[in-house]
Amino acid sequence: MPLILEDALLSAADGLVQSGSKIWFHFQKYPWDLACPEQNPGVGEHRRHIETRLTQGLPDPKLAHVLSGTYHLGISPHIYSYYHLLADLLPHLIASQKFPVLVPEFMPNQFIDLLKEAEFEAQVLSPEIFMVERLLIPEMNIPDWNSEKVKLIQYFFEKIVPLKSLPNSQSSNSEKRIYVSRKLAVKRHLSNEDEFLPLLKKHKFSKIYLEHLSVPEQVQLFRSASHVIAAHGAGLTNILFASADVKILEIRPVLTSGQFCFENLFSLGWPRSEHLVPPLSGEFALPLELLDEVLERWQGEPKT
């Protein structure tokens, strides 16, 4: 359930919310009571995130701009990520009564365009302090995914991105083998991509930069995918739109990348998924022999 606060102080730079002696960070993921420290987690990720954030200070009510009315909170430190847009914010907006959504300046324009296309009113806030008359904060589930959330997202995109709705879109029966490159990403890009691309080309894979595609274009691409190979990253969230028999290879820097977030997602409807962890620590490179083994095995498997 969303948390509903009245006269809440909001730091629009990162989404920290304060009401009285209580604060919330990363939507409802990290609550904290300033007046009762004994009730807060003593150790762990929760405490670390809050203590780090508190070094920056709390919102100053003297600097607050007043926002009258009711709003959804759409600001969190990771809301620039496609994964967190779909896992954290969209399910809340879909299931809630429509009010304007407060989003940060750092939210990508294509995310804002998606919200507007879905008839959500997005209000972009500068990184200042605001006093919000009534604020709805999204709930954070553990784990991130469940069957209900998956169906909610899929149904939502079926309405706003119908099949064959885009120019030159492929039919649902077409089969595309795609490799999602993270070469344009700041982190988690495979250092030896140029070495294994010929092997992928041999097996009829196409290299895709999701940064060059709109959200609807990404949805359509994955609807037509028969095989997906990608390093651990937000683009794999698009498996939500792939068929149940798609073959997936997730390449992780370490076994526990993202606290198994995609493994959890794939377990809800995509049984033909697997992962590889490069054997050399400190280097995110994919050995050709490991990739070749997977590709040859896939090649020999009968079509379903």
Language model features with spans:
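The feature primarily captures lumenal catalytic ectodomains
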Residues: 1-304
